[in-house]
Regions:
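N-terminal, positively charged/glycine-rich alpha-helical extensions of SAM-dependent methyltransferases
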Residues: 1-32
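Conserved alpha-helix/loop element of class I SAM-dependent methyltransferases that forms part
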Residues: 41-58
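Class I SAM-dependent methyltransferase SAM/SAH-binding core
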Residues: 63-65, 69-114
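A short acidic, Gly/Pro-enriched loop at the edge of an enzyme's catalytic core
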Residues: 113-125
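A short glycine-rich, Lys/Arg-flanked "PGG" loop and its adjoining helix->strand segment in the class I
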Residues: 138-153
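Short, glycine-/aromatic-enriched active-site segment of Class I SAM-dependent methyltransferases
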Residues: 156-176
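Short alpha-helix
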Residues: 176-192
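Conserved Class I S-adenosyl-L-methionine
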Residues: 200-256
Length: 256
């Protein structure tokens, strides 16, 4: 499964059209869209701020689980010194970019569901729009709780898909199925977290992202950068993807 994920994302995340849409920022997530948000990069930065607001005292160390190309890690440097920040990912190609985006941070090739850290290693953990890929969320949550220090906080955003969508994805994805925010909260508690605050941000993140993405594609078509067939195919693909996201939880879980 990891090889399949890398094959897709190592191509998509370096595609010229995708990079243009994300403002060459190296973010690749839905972002948080408020009234007045104009660009995807701005929305991605707003999502980071929304998640980090769950951590009022930004102290100690923080782990960026599934850090992608390091844009999320770079944003953490607004609040943490580089030596306090660790990023992990399963793609060495993306980690090479991450090291350039967030110099001084520690980056390690590592599976988020099999953390190779000692117990109580971090004060905080963040994971942005990645846990639906993990094998599985439950394993990741248990591992996250293990490596957090007492009183530590896990913050994340995630996509909860329909059962139909999970069935057509790679084998094993149904083992990672979570029905709704209530089920997510129960999963956090069973992993060892004492409580979990959850906001369902499907409208603010996934739905508004889709509108912005299609608007961008139409603009590129009018400019002659892509043809109408490409516009139709990409718009249909993105619409199907978002239509099958039932919930987009923002989660803050705290270890006792």
């Amino acid at each position: 499964v990891a090889d399949q994920i890398n094959q897709v994302y190592d191509q998509v995340m370096y595609d010229d059209l995708y990079r243009e849409y994300w403002g060459h920022s190296d973010f690749v997530n839905f972002g948080w869209w408020e009234k007045g948000t104009r660009e995807q990069k701005e929305a991605c930065e707003a999502l980071m701020e929304k998640l980090l607001a769950f951590i009022p005292e930004k102290q100690g160390t923080i782990l960026d689980a599934a850090c992608g190309k390091g844009a999320t890690t770079r944003h953490l440097l607004k609040y943490w010194a580089p030596e306090a920040v660790t990023g992990i990912n399963i793609s060495e190609k993306q980690l090479e970019t991450a090291r350039a985006n967030a110099p001084g941070c520690r980056f390690i090739l590592m599976n988020a569901a099999e953390l190779q850290f000692e117990d109580a290693s971090f004060d905080n953990i963040i994971s942005v729009e990645a846990a639906f890929h993990f094998d599985t969320r439950e394993k990741f949550l248990r591992e996250a709780c293990r490596v957090l220090k007492p009183g530590g906080t896990l913050v994340l955003s995630d996509s909860l898909f329909t059962r139909w969508w999970e069935r057509i994805k790679p084998p094993g994805r149904l083992l990672n199925f979570v029905e709704d925010p209530d089920a997510y909260r129960a999963l956090c508690q069973s992993a060892g977290f004492k409580d979990a605050e959850i906001i369902d941000a499907r409208e603010e993140c996934a739905v508004r992202f889709l509108r912005a993405c299609i608007r961008f594609l139409r603009g590129r078509c009018l400019a002659g950068a892509i043809d109408r067939e490409t516009l139709t195919k990409m718009s249909a693909r993105m619409s199907l993807y978002v239509m099958n996201i039932r919930h987009y939880p923002l989660v803050a879980a705290r270890k006792a």
